[in-house]
Amino acid sequence: MIDISGKDIVLREAIAEGFIKLKKDTIEKITKREIEKGDVIATAKVAGILAAKKTHELLPMCHPIPLEYINVEIEIENDGLKVVSTVRAHYRTGVEMEALTATSIALLTIWDMVKKYEKDEEGQYPLTEISKIRVVSKIKSYG
């Protein structure tokens, strides 16, 4: 890890988003809460929050950051689900990796919970796709 001891402790915020493309039937099942494994949206939100807290354990060069706020929102769209994660902390380094981790794990949780409905006759996933994972914004505030 790099030495951040000389940096000021300031408010850090990062927002990351990502998308999972799903079959229309699967989206309908999610909306109607008909997924056998449970409430997809609630489970993915919790998974994202837990993942953000574990980022430093997953990424070898990440600092353990005392996170003060994590929010994972999931929006149902026509062709899939969009995940938006917001993370905040007062610390010496940014929280982009925590926001990206929250988003990524929420998306993987969605895939895991709906994979039964996404497979074709041969057990493949011809439509399912995770994409557009990115940092939407990053704030470093001295105020």
Curated annotation (Swiss-Prot):
<dbReference type="InterPro" id="IPR002820">
    <property type="entry name" value="Mopterin_CF_biosynth-C_dom"/>
</dbReference>
<protein>
    <recommendedName>
        <fullName>Probable cyclic pyranopterin monophosphate synthase</fullName>
        <ecNumber>4.6.1.17</ecNumber>
    </recommendedName>
</protein>
<dbReference type="Pfam" id="PF01967">
    <property type="entry name" value="MoaC"/>
</dbReference>
<comment type="similarity">
    <text>Belongs to the MoaC family.</text>
</comment>
<feature type="binding site">
    <location>
        <begin position="61"/>
        <end position="63"/>
    </location>
    <ligand>
        <name>substrate</name>
    </ligand>
</feature>
<dbReference type="GO" id="GO:0006777">
    <property type="term" value="P:Mo-molybdopterin cofactor biosynthetic process"/>
</dbReference>
<dbReference type="InterPro" id="IPR023045">
    <property type="entry name" value="MoaC"/>
</dbReference>
<dbReference type="InterPro" id="IPR023047">
    <property type="entry name" value="Mo_CF_biosynth-C_arc"/>
</dbReference>
<feature type="active site">
    <location>
        <position position="112"/>
    </location>
</feature>
<comment type="pathway">
    <text>Cofactor biosynthesis; molybdopterin biosynthesis.</text>
</comment>
<keyword id="KW-0501">Molybdenum cofactor biosynthesis</keyword>
<keyword id="KW-0456">Lyase</keyword>
<dbReference type="InterPro" id="IPR036522">
    <property type="entry name" value="MoaC_sf"/>
</dbReference>
<feature type="binding site">
    <location>
        <begin position="97"/>
        <end position="98"/>
    </location>
    <ligand>
        <name>substrate</name>
    </ligand>
</feature>
<dbReference type="GO" id="GO:0061799">
    <property type="term" value="F:cyclic pyranopterin monophosphate synthase activity"/>
</dbReference>
<dbReference type="InterPro" id="IPR050105">
    <property type="entry name" value="MoCo_biosynth_MoaA/MoaC"/>
</dbReference>
<comment type="subunit">
    <text>Homohexamer; trimer of dimers.</text>
</comment>
<comment type="function">
    <text>Catalyzes the conversion of (8S)-3',8-cyclo-7,8-dihydroguanosine 5'-triphosphate to cyclic pyranopterin monophosphate (cPMP).</text>
</comment>
